[in-house]
A protein has these predicted regions:
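Conserved catalytic-core motifs of GNAT/GCN5-like acyltransferases
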Residues: 94-96, 113-128
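Conserved acetyl-CoA-binding loop-helix of GNAT-fold acetyltransferases
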Residues: 70-83, 108-109
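Short acidic/glycine-enriched loop/turn segments that link adjacent beta-strands
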Residues: 31, 55, 101, 121-125
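Acetyl-CoA-dependent GNAT
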Residues: 4-60, 65, 78-79, 84, ...
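Helix-turn-helix
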Residues: 103, 110
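Conserved GNAT acetyl-CoA-binding A-motif
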Residues: 85-98
Length: 137
């Protein structure tokens, strides 16, 4: 099941998502910008997003806990997020990943196209992906 995160999910999210400050995570939850994948009563993954240039949904984090990977849960989260963005009137979405071939293949398989590369000193290349949303997808 895919659902919006609630304030009750914050302790679980904070224990697993170390890439965002707790206060920012709480704000994103309150804005409906965090989705939870759940199996039974157990959260097994999440998708967190914000806006790029204040006008394009950008997926900042997609993570599925190890025992639940390769079961289509990531695809379900992304599909739900894209549907939500489409319903809100957005024409496109974006995301990025470090130069990890498996993650690149995942996004390309979902229809994302390479849009650029971010190079930071001492960091792996970050590949930016873009996807046009259609009314029927």
């Amino acid at each position: 099941m895919i659902r919006f995160a609630t304030p009750a999910d914050l302790p679980w999210l904070q224990a697993h998502d170390h890439h965002v400050a707790p206060v920012e995570l709480a704000t994103l939850v309150s804005l409906g910008r965090v989705l939870i994948a759940q199996e039974g009563d157990e959260p097994v993954g999440w998708l967190r997003w914000n806006l790029f240039w204040d006008n394009t949904p950008f997926m900042n984090m997609l993570y599925i806990l190890e025992p639940w990977q390769r079961r289509g849960i990531g695809r379900q989260l992304v599909n739900r997020w894209e549907s939500q963005a489409r319903e809100a009137g957005f024409a496109a979405v974006m995301t990025s990943t470090q130069a990890n071939e498996e993650a690149q293949h995942f996004y390309r398989k979902l229809g994302y196209r390479d849009a650029g590369v971010l190079l930071l000193p001492g960091e792996a290349a970050e590949i930016i992906f873009h996807k046009e949303l259609t009314a029927h997808a």
